[in-house]
């Protein structure tokens, strides 16, 4: 058995400005920082063996801030993919026992919003019409101009989860994923076997952890309080 913790990053500066963010690398706002710390307090007693984030800073900030309150007192350290960086950041002491590896991947990035990125959501609705913007945002396979649909997002998140993260859970490793609303929705669709209609109604608030227990056969959603 193993725990899987999913956390949508805290509010970003652009979330608060009501702008489409997507792959634009925007940091957390002060409210987002507070949300990340509070989320860490909620999951502080759950075992965590490894952490995964997207390549975007708001995802990384959320994970690092959340872990400052973990009861294990272990420190996250980033595992670099580049061979030279990987070798140069190697730990040669017992201190490694007090650390938790953190892996970053663009496969977990937010849905890419294409030509909507940086635009105000309300102004976009006024420009293109509310129905068109609703289709771009809430349909399963319709993408905004030069952007991704939720389906497209799942085409990178789900294989990464199945090939890289799921084997860890099968080996009883407890995993914490800090990512984004749409990348996590696509993962939850796979984990909970949701239909296209069901996933479209799924809302994930910022800074609110979801916890699953992998039983060896299935994922079970755990109620709060966790631990």
Curated annotation (Swiss-Prot):
Catalyzed reactions per annotation: (2R)-2-phosphoglycerate = (2R)-3-phosphoglycerate
Matching InterPro entries: His_Pase_superF_clade-1 (IPR013078), His_PPase_superfam (IPR029033), Phosphogly_mut1 (IPR005952)
Described purpose of this protein according to its UniProt entry: Catalyzes the interconversion of 2-phosphoglycerate and 3-phosphoglycerate.
Organism: Chlamydia felis (strain Fe/C-56) (Chlamydophila felis)
Lineage of source species: Bacteria, Pseudomonadati, Chlamydiota, Chlamydiia, Chlamydiales
Keywords, sorted A to Z: Gluconeogenesis, Glycolysis, Isomerase
Principal EC category: isomerase
Official protein name in the record: 2,3-bisphosphoglycerate-dependent phosphoglycerate mutase
Binding site for substrate: 8-15, 21-22, 58, 110-113, 121, 137-138, 181-182
SMART domains named among the record's database cross-references: PGAM
Residues flagged as site, Transition state stabilizer: 180
Keyword hit for Transferase: no
Gene Ontology MF terms: phosphoglycerate mutase activity
GO biological process entries: gluconeogenesis; glycolytic process
Active site: 9 (tele-phosphohistidine intermediate), 110 (proton donor/acceptor)
Enzyme Commission (EC) number: 5.4.2.11
Annotated pathway: Carbohydrate degradation; glycolysis; pyruvate from D-glyceraldehyde 3-phosphate: step 3/5
Database matches in Gene3D superfamilies: Phosphoglycerate mutase-like
Keyword Cytoplasm among UniProt keywords: no
């Amino acid at each position: 058995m193993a725990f899987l913790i999913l956390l949508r990053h805290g509010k970003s500066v652009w979330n608060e400005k009501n702008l489409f963010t997507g792959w634009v690398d925007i940091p957390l706002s002060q409210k987002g920082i507070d949300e990340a710390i509070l989320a860490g307090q909620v999951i502080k007693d759950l075992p965590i063996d490894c952490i995964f984030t997207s390549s975007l800073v708001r995802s990384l900030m959320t994970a690092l801030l959340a872990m400052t309150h973990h009861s294990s007192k272990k420190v996250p350290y980033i595992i670099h993919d580049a061979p030279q960086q990987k070798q140069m950041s190697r730990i040669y002491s017992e201190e490694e026992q007090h650390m938790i590896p953190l892996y970053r991947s663009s496969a977990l990035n937010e849905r890419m919003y294409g030509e909507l990125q940086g635009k105000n959501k309300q102004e976009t609705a006024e420009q293109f019409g509310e129905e068109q913007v609703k289709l771009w945002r809430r349909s399963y396979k319709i993408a905004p101009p030069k952007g991704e649909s939720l389906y497209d997002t799942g085409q990178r998140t789900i294989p990464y989860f199945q090939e890289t993260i799921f084997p860890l859970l099968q080996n009883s490793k407890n995993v914490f994923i800090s990512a984004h609303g749409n990348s996590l929705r696509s993962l939850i669709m796979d984990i909970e076997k949701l239909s296209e209609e069901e996933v479209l109604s799924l809302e994930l608030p910022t800074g609110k952890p979801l916890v699953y227990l992998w039983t060896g056969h299935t994922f079970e959603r755990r109620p709060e309080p966790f631990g």
